[in-house]
Structure formats: structure tokens, C-alpha cells
């Protein structure tokens, strides 16, 4: 059985690999991430149509968890983002993200900020004495 801490480590690793693939795809299509994309530019259109295989792997990994484990992961992430207690985040997110698809989508949307969010969220949970696998 994978613990929440182990899952977060794996999620972070998958996200870092996905970020490298994003950079490679941007480079292949001549996109300068500092300048952003012109939505209607043919290079930007081609780039948006590319699939990041590592994003797919991350989504598959997340979908392999039950919803309660995903809620813990999501709550830790949002606690690190918002600075609110992890348990409060979990309870609030349960209302606004009622389905597993909602939870996976919102976790995926924060991929570029995982390291900072999870670092702060894990530190806060530790300071609050929260058991990551049972809260």
C-alpha cells in the first residue's frame, strides 16, 4: 500500500518529468515560454494539439487512487497554497470538488506549482500533528 507521502513524492516526480516534456514541446514548436503563446499563431495551435505523454501518466497515476486518498493529497496541496489548515481544506474541497474527476482535474491544474505547494502543505501538516494517511 502506498502512503500519502510516497504518493506525493511520485506525483512530484511525474510532474517534473512532464515539465521537461513541456519545455521540449515548446522548443520543438518555437514557443518562448517567457513570451507566452499567441493563441491564433500556427505554432501555438500546433503546440496545443501536442499531447504531453507524461501528463497522461500523471493523470493515470492519480486515477489509480481512491477518492479519499486523492482528497488528502488535494487538501495538502491547497493547504500549502492557501496557508489554511489541511483538515479545513479537505472539508471545504469536499463541497466544491465532489467527484473523483473534479479532484484529479484540480490537482493536475496545479502541476507547475507542486513543489512549493506540497513543501508548505507537508510542513503545515507536520506542525499541526496530522497523520497524512488518516486525516
Q: What positions do the PLM features span?
A:
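Aromatic-anchored, charged helix-turn/loop surface patch used as a conserved interaction hotspot
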Residues: 1-70, 78
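Serine/threonine-rich low-complexity intrinsically disordered regions
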Residues: 3, 41, 53, 86, ...
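A general "mature secreted/periplasmic domain" signal
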Residues: 8-11, 17-21, 83-90, 97-100, ...
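Residue-level signal for secondary-structure boundary elements
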Residues: 19, 23-26, 70-73, 82, ...
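Short, surface-exposed, charged/polar-biased interaction segments
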Residues: 28, 32-35, 39, 79-86, ...
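Surface-exposed molecular-recognition determinants
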Residues: 44, 50, 54, 71-73, ...
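Amphipathic protein-protein interaction modules
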Residues: 59-108
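Helix-rich interaction surfaces within compact, conserved domain-sized segments
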Residues: 97-135
Amino acid at each position: 500500500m502506498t502512503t500519502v507521502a510516497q504518493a506525493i513524492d511520485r506525483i512530484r516526480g511525474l510532474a517534473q518529468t512532464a515539465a521537461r516534456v513541456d519545455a521540449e514541446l515548446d522548443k520543438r514548436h518555437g514557443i518562448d515560454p517567457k513570451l507566452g503563446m499567441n493563441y491564433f499563431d500556427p505554432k501555438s495551435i500546433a503546440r496545443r494539439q501536442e499531447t504531453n505523454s507524461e501528463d497522461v501518466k500523471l493523470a493515470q497515476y492519480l486515477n489509480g487512487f481512491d477518492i479519499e486518498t486523492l482528497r488528502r493529497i488535494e487538501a495538502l496541496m491547497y493547504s500549502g497554497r492557501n496557508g489554511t489548515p489541511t483538515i479545513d481544506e479537505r472539508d471545504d474541497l469536499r463541497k466544491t470538488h465532489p467527484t473523483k474527476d473534479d479532484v484529479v482535474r484540480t490537482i493536475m491544474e496545479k502541476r507547475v506549482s507542486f513543489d512549493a505547494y506540497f513543501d508548505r502543505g507537508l510542513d503545515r501538516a507536520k506542525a499541526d500533528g496530522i497523520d497524512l494517511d488518516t486525516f
